[in-house]
């Protein structure tokens, strides 16, 4: 008896329709694409109760002819193609004839339409779940078509319940999809409205029939986003992308849109390449981009998935390589932006004058060091500020020389005022003893070098002249490749690089000579009298390596007494130790019935209450026993996690009113999420006023921001919370800055590594872990506990 039977047509229809219409976004997508295919220039999308009650798309397209009323909802009836070969020259979004038929299968569909010749009289078509025409009514209607889908997924109970449960998330996905179509559709006006039970019809987003994609981006995402974009037009590529600078990109990749011939598609490989190219320019940030690829229809296959967003490219590798090279060239042409610090001088100096004993005293240089015109220009795009550890670079003398090169071709700062009187007197007082000490130090160096040379049978004695004629003029550092940089090893000051002409110095053999040179005030040129001997003469005198006969080596011997009984004892002891180590590192047979017990160990929070503290190891870890297992618990990480969750649960956020309220420039989806979660946002300390009469994106005004001691939060923290709520509306999010602040505070107040604990204190730390929601890691990611071994294996 045959068990293979055909599926009835009704079941086939429901199964296939469930693949095409999977959520609110896919339903809206099919309706909007039908409107675009009809040649509409104005498209209006209306949601009632987040799409749960109804979704309606109204356009001013060509309308539906009277001869198509009966077949408009039938499966695989379409006006787009007649045979498979037409796909190679396809110019429309749809081609399967499944959209309206699938919508009929999962909801109640009502179509109102009128052609150019019929308007202002139109027809209302009521379709059943099979797509058949139930009845037809004459109504007043302008040219175009309206498709309304009521009670979406009424025939699929599981999907209906999921929609009612996750309606905000599904609505956000639909709005994001409409943002993409509104962005790519030039010369077309998009309007999206939403109406709930407690509010009137609210505009979510709109465009103004713009001729350029960037204007659409400005309408949809706001001026802040559009102003951070640059055009990307190269061959098959047209569109806009974020500037490769920090501040122009975003923390998430939710605003990345790829189109092929203006069809929204998923191309993960291309998106990944764009992300990789941007990574060196903006770490941990994602660029915004809206890119359309103009590709010949014959080289792409769009008949891959029910939603037509997955495509195959015959020349994918070549296209990816072209996009990569094009984007790299675009990023390199943009240069790299460095924020200017207009309130700081281009250079900051702090002088450090070492005295004869190596101690140092900070001296102030003149505060006014005017630079050349190129350095003081307001149009400068480079701001240079020395860190505290690098400021003490200038050693003062009676006539100090300051020479700092910022970049190739940069002008040098000129000293315009004399040194302070106190600094001049101090410098004059030091100048004479300094020369005397240099001379004495040089004499001592001669003697030590002579002793060193004679003791090692070498003739490489060098002498350092006792006089060091110094030149003080302000010169630009020499480009001579023989210049040598010697680091100052003096512990009394920050290491300073000294410029010494290699052609004028004889040699330096140990740290004392380097220290002697470093104690001299910094100059651009330092000359030493004696010259380096020729290479040939130096090699002839070199006697460092001498061959020695093998029998000249020292010989050592020692008598060892060995007894047979001692060897036997050692063997027994080694065997016992080997058996013990094998038990600890036992390898279990994979066929063992209890193999999972050896590989997995489950610990529940309640187990912390039953753990017995054995003691403390290395003043950093608590050793505990639970059942047959031995654990170590990190005392600092565990206490830190307890303090962190305690601070988080008892956090009181204070708000600081803004002197001037700030109008928020938000995307439509961000604004919707903020309005839907306004009570939660206000509990986070953000005071927000809402004016529904304003245009979309500017309805919210920031009145106050949360503060905590010296930390003041801003709009970036608010946007981060909104982003989390859009993805996970059921959680209570904290901004990452607040998380870091609480983690830092918890860390500082926790038990530190190195502190000896009593048994009572160790028990308290272990018991606290049972009270936490997630006790397994500290806020910084370090695990709180580790399993050591099973006691039965010892």
UniProtKB/Swiss-Prot annotation:
Record-stated family: Belongs to the DNA mismatch repair MutL/HexB family.
Keyword DNA damage: yes
Chain spans, region Disordered: 351-384, 409-442
Molecular-function GO terms, alphabetical: ATP binding; ATP hydrolysis activity; ATP-dependent DNA damage sensor activity; mismatched DNA binding
Name of the protein in its database record: DNA mismatch repair protein pms1
Summary of the function given for this chain in its UniProt record: This protein is involved in the repair of mismatches in DNA.
Biased composition (Basic and acidic residues): 419-429
Keyword list, A-Z: DNA damage, DNA repair
InterPro entries from the UniProt entry: DNA_mismatch_repair_CS, DNA_mismatch_S5_2-like, HATPase_C_sf, MutL/Mlh/PMS, MutL/Mlh/Pms-like, MutL_C, MutL_C_dimsub, MutL_C_regsub
Polar residues bias spans: 352-371, 430-442
Pfam families hit by this protein: DNA_mis_repair (PF01119), HATPase_c_3 (PF13589), MutL_C (PF08676)
GO cellular component entries: MutLalpha complex; nuclear chromosome; nucleus
Source species: Schizosaccharomyces pombe (strain 972 / ATCC 24843)
Disulfide topology: none
Source organism superkingdom: Eukaryota
Any GO BP: mismatch repair
SMART domains: DNA_mis_repair, MutL_C
